[in-house]
Design a protein with these regions (language model features):
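Conserved NAD(P)H cofactor-binding loop of Rossmann-fold oxidoreductase domains
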Residues: 80-85
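Conserved glycine-rich cofactor-binding loop
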Residues: 6-7
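SDR active-site lid
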Residues: 162-229, 236
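Conserved glycine-rich Rossmann-like NAD(P)H-binding loop of the short-chain dehydrogenase/reductase
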Residues: 20-36
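Residue(s) in the substrate-gating loop at a strand-loop-helix junction
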Residues: 132
Length: 255
C-alpha cells in the first residue's frame, strides 16, 4: 500500500515496489492519475495494481479505507501522503491547518493501526513512515507541519522497538527537499528558488534508498545533505538558537 501515490515520493515508491515484483494498492485523492499510474506499472512490470482513491484528510474516507485494508494481507505500508504550509500560524487558513493535521498524523496513525496487528500475528511485514528532518526541531513559519512530522518521527521509532521481535520492520524516512525533475524558471516555486539545486534529491533515489533501508530494518534513513544537517542541528544545537534562524529561512517560503 502506498499513500500519496499520485506524484513525487509516493509515485516513485510505487514504481520501485512494482520493479521489485510487489502487487500494489495505490491511494491518493486523484483517481484519474492513479488509474493511469496503475496501467503504466502493470504494463511495465506485470504486477497487479489496485486503486483506492481516498482523501485521507476526510475522517470518514480514512475509516472506510482502514476497514478495507484490515481485512487484507498487507505486506508493506508506505505512509507517505502529506502536505505542508508556510507562514505564521495566525495568518494561515485554520481549516486547512486542521486538514493538514488529519492527513499528516491521524491518517498515518489510523492506517498503521489497521495493518500492524495482522503483521505482528503473521510475523512479517514492513511499514515505511515518511516523516521529516523538520520534525526534529521547532520551525517557526512551518509550525503545523513540523509538529505533525515530530509525531510521525516519534511514532515510527517507538513502534519499531515494539515490533522488531515479531519480524516486522519499521523505518522512518526523513527526507530533505525532493523533486522529480528540475523545473523551468517559469515553473519554479518559491521553494525551488530558495533551495539550491545541489541540495535537492530525486524522488527515485529517495524511494530506492528508503525501500533498501526498510528491507534491512534500519531505524531511520536520511537522504541528502540538507536533511542530514537538519537532523544533526535538531539533535545537538540548543532549540532556542535554531528556532529563530530556521524560522527566518522558512518565512521566505510563505511570502
Amino acid at each position: 500500500v502506498v499513500t500519496g501515490a499520485s506524484s513525487g515520493i509516493g509515485e516513485a515508491l510505487a514504481t520501485e515496489l512494482a520493479r521489485r515484483g510487489h502487487s500494489l494498492i495505490l491511494v491518493a485523492r486523484r483517481e484519474e492519475i492513479l488509474q493511469d499510474t496503475a496501467v503504466d506499472l502493470t504494463k511495465r512490470f506485470g504486477v497487479e495494481v489496485e486503486v483506492m482513491a481516498t482523501d485521507l484528510s476526510d475522517p470518514d474516507a480514512t475509516t472506510a479505507l482502514c476497514s478495507a485494508l484490515a481485512g487484507r494481507e498487507i505486506s508493506i505500508l508506505c505512509n507517505n501522503a502529506g502536505i505542508a504550509t508556510f507562514g505564521p500560524l495566525a495568518e494561515l487558513d485554520a481549516e486547512y491547518e486542521r486538514a493538514q493535521v488529519r492527513l499528516n498524523t491521524i491518517a498515518v496513525h489510523d492506517l498503521t493501526l489497521a495493518v500492524i496487528p495482522q503483521m505482528v500475528k503473521r510475523g512479517s511485514g514492513g511499514i515505511l513512515m515518511v516523516g521529516s528532518a523538520a520534525g526534529n526541531m521547532p520551525i517557526p513559519n512551518n509550525a503545523t507541519y513540523a509538529a505533525s512530522k515530530a509525531f510521525v518521527n516519534s511514532l515510527s521509532e517507538s513502534l519499531r522497538g515494539e515490533v522488531a521481535a515479531h519480524g516486522v520492520h519499521v523505518t522512518l524516512l526523513a527526507p530533505g527537499p525532493v523533486r522529480t525533475q528540475t523545473p523551468t524558471p517559469e515553473e519554479a516555486s518559491i521553494v525551488d528558488r530558495v533551495v539550491p539545486d545541489f541540495l535537492w534529491n530525486s524522488s527515485e533515489y529517495v524511494a530506492k534508498s528508503s525501500l533498501d533501508a526498510l528491507e534491512r530494518n534500519k531505524m531511520r534513513v536520511v537522504p541528502g545533505a540538507l536533511s542530514k544537517s537538519m537532523s544533526v542541528a535538531g539533535g545537538y544545537i540548543p532549540r532556542n538558537l535554531t528556532a529563530p534562524i530556521v524560522g527566518r529561512f522558512y518565512r521566505k517560503f510563505g511570502d
